[in-house]
Regions:
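Short helix-loop boundary/capping segments at the starts of domains
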Residues: 31-38, 57-64, 107
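N-terminal low-complexity, Ser/Thr- and acidic-residue-enriched intrinsically disordered segments
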Residues: 1-54
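Short, flexible active-site-adjacent loop segments at beta-strand->alpha-helix junctions, enriched
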Residues: 9, 61, 120-121
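Charged, often glycine-rich, active-site loop that binds/positions anionic groups
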Residues: 48-73
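Alpha-helical structural motif
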Residues: 21, 51-54, 59, 94, ...
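A general "terminal functional-core" signal
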Residues: 3, 71-310
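A general structural signal for well-ordered alpha-helical segments in protein cores
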Residues: 22, 64, 95-98
Length: 310
């Protein structure tokens, strides 16, 4: 299991959970490497260049210029942060981590999981940021996967953040990305959208037990044969209504089902704020649970892949 991250993920001067927590998760990966075998890697130079090119191609030129220069400030700070030069670096490196993970994951034919400690993605569309999100690495990653031949059928974006992924829906709709479907389970109606076709949005108001039942039902209803890549936006902000243990069970359900379907998966971080967890360390620990859940699935994949290669 390889998780992508470098210190440019935390380049912005603006200190907020979204711009700082990935470093703590990265520290946990390094500290536990000998025990878990999970590797931390920086996005490769070729993917940094590819990410910058994709951002320049897919995003509105006015928004790209604003992210680079801070002008106009209303657009440059549309993500909710004060602009500084680190915003652009963060956007490029965070996006590069997603596409690097997609590239590496697709190379394994019997289902596999990799991740990027990218966060602040799904409220941004291709014209502006919103809700602490700057560049939508989910949508950019899906575009990269399809156009580079890593997903020859369709890409499924599973978004289990507390809030709706309206930015993702706007992005893929405005660019006519009909090879992307979105499965969105939220606990809060912020950034909601009208789901049509193969897209689905469920806003769940119940308790933890019914939430996990909803996760299982939604995963069971997916036409998995339609897809050859899954991108998982692993939000931890359904907490505190959903406990830390409940979120871990949810991640196990997601990764187990993807394993059963022998599909490649790339996950990113989402949600998770000190306002509901108490400390940034608790936020990082909960995100790390997602990393550990993905590693447990790889323990199941390894013997399966080995037997298939005999």
């Amino acid at each position: 299991l390889t998780i992508y991250w470098d210190n440019k993920y935390v380049a912005p001067e603006h200190a907020f959970d979204t711009t700082r927590k990935s470093e703590l998760v990265a520290d946990l990966i390094v500290e536990t490497h000998e025990e878990t075998g999970i590797a931390l890697a920086a996005p490769k130079i070729e993917f940094l260049g590819k990410a910058e090119s994709l951002i320049e191609t897919l995003l509105d030129p006015k928004y790209v210029e604003a992210l680079r220069t801070g002008v106009p400030i209303s657009l440059a700070s549309s993500n909710g942060f004060e602009w500084d030069e680190g915003i652009w670096d963060m956007a490029v490196h965070s996006t590069a981590g997603v596409i690097n993970a997609i590239y590496e994951t697709e190379k394994r034919p019997f289902g596999s999981v990799n991740g990027s400690l990218s966060s602040g993605l799904h409220h941004a569309d291709n014209k502006r940021g919103m809700g602490f999100c700057t560049v939508n690495g989910l949508a950019v990653g899906a575009y990269y996967a399809h156009t580079e031949g890593h997903a020859k059928k369709k890409v499924l974006i599973i978004d289990f953040d507390a809030h709706c992924g309206g930015g993702t829906m706007s992005f893929i709709t405005s660019l006519g990305m009909d090879w992307v479907d979105q499965l969105d389970l939220s606990t809060n109606g912020f950034d909601s959208y009208v789901a049509a076709g193969n897209h689905e949005l469920v806003i769940h108001r119940g308790d933890e037990r019914s939430y996990l039942q909803e996760v299982w039902s939604l995963l069971d209803a997916v036409e998995w044969d339609d897809y050859d890549l899954v991108l998982y936006n692993a939000g931890i902000d359904p907490h505190p209504r959903i406990s830390v243990n409940g979120l871990a069970q949810r991640d196990e359900l997601v990764f187990n089902r993807i394993f059963q379907e022998t599909l490649p998966c790339v996950f990113v971080l989402a949600g998770g704020y000190t306002s509901s967890y108490g400390t940034i360390e608790e936020v990082a620990d909960t995100h790390f649970n997602t990393v550990l859940a993905s590693e447990r699935i790889l323990d199941l994949i390894r013997p399966f892949a080995s037997s298939k290669s005999l």
